[in-house]
Amino acid sequence: KRDFIDSRANLTQLLMEECLSGFPKLPKDTFVIWTGIKNNAETVENLYKGGKTPHCSSAYDFRSWLAGHLGLTNGGMEINAACASSTVGVALATQFIAEGKYDHILVAGADTVSRFVYYGFAALKAMTEKACMPFDINRNGLSLGDGAVALFLSVKRNTDIRVAGCGVTNDANHITGPSRDGAGLAQAMRQAIEMAGLGTDAVQGFCAHGTGTRYNDTMEILAARSVFGDLQPPMFGLKGAIGHTLGAAGGIEVALSGKCLAQEIIPPTVGCKSPESPEIVLEKMPFPGKNILTSNLGFGGVNAAVLMEKLS
C-alpha cells in the first residue's frame, strides 16, 4: 500500500517534470500557485487505516517540492476549486500581477486517476462505459485522464499570447450538480469578456468545459446562448481527446487555447458526432481569430472563465 501511494506521488512529480522540461529558467521571485486537487486521497485513506504518510502527499507538499525543484524562493499558495482550480489560479495570478503584488507567477498542477476519484464519479453515475462524447446528443458521461499543466504569467511581455480577461463566480447550486440554467457560468464569461474590454460579439472562439455528462453540456450550451445570442463563436471541447484531468483541466485548456491562437487552428471536439448545437466544431478548422474564451466548472457551484488574446 505504501509503495502504491508513493508511486502516485512520484507519477505526479514525473508529470510536472515532463511538463516543465521545455521551460526556461524562471526568476527566483516567481510566486507559485498549485492547483492539483486529488493526489492525496489515497494518503487520507491510508492514514485512516493506521498507515504512514509518503514523502509528498498534500497540495502544500507538492507546491513546496515544485518551488524547491525550480529554485524559487518567493513562497506560494494552493487552490482547490475542484475542476475549475487552475482556471481560478490563472484568474488570481492575473489579479495579483495587475495589483503589483508579484511580477512573475507560475500556475501549476497535476492530477492523476485514482481509485478514490474513480469511485466518486462512478457513485455519481457520471462515468461513461464507452468513449467520452462531449456535446453529442448521445453522450452518457465523462472519462478521467492524467494530466499536468504549468503556466508562467509575467508582468513582462514574453510572448504574443496574453490573458486579457478573467471571471469567477459561484452559483451555490449544489455540492456536485451544475446549475441547470447556466446563469452563474454566463456571469463568469461576461466578466472575462468585460475585463478584456470587448463586447460579447467580439469573442471569436470558445473552448468549453465539455465533460460529456448530460446536464453539464446542456447547461454550457444554454450559458453560451445567453452570452452570445445569435452570434455564436465556434465552440469546442478537449476532454474527448485527453479525458477530464480535474484540477489541471482548466489550465491545460488555457494553454491549448493559446496554442490554437498561435497556430491559427481550432481542433475538433473529439467524440462528438451528432452535436446538440450547431456551433460545436466537429473537424479541425483554420482560425485566424485574435481571441478565445475558455471556461470551467467545479463542484460546489464554482464557475471560471479566461479570455486569451493574441497581440500580433
Language-model features: locations:
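Condensing-enzyme catalytic core mediating Claisen C-C bond formation in acyl metabolism
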Residues: M127, A131-A196, Q204-G205
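Conserved beta-strand-centric core segments of catalytic alpha/beta enzyme folds
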Residues: K1-E18, T35, T87-N158, A249-S312
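Glycine-rich beta-alpha junction loops
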Residues: G36-N39, A110-V113, A148, G165-A172, ...
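Conserved active-site "lid/cap" helical segment
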Residues: K1-G36, N40-A41, A188-T200, V227
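Short glycine/threonine-rich loop-to-helix capping motif typified by GTGT followed
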Residues: I175-D181, T211-F228, G247-I252, E283
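Beta-strand segments within the central parallel beta-sheet cores of soluble alpha/beta enzyme folds
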Residues: D29-W34, M77-N80, D103-A110, D160-C166, ...
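Structural element of the ATP-grasp superfamily
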Residues: M16, L66-A67, F152, M189, ...
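Conserved catalytic cysteine-centered active-site region
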Residues: K1-N10, N39-L92, K101, V117-Y119, ...
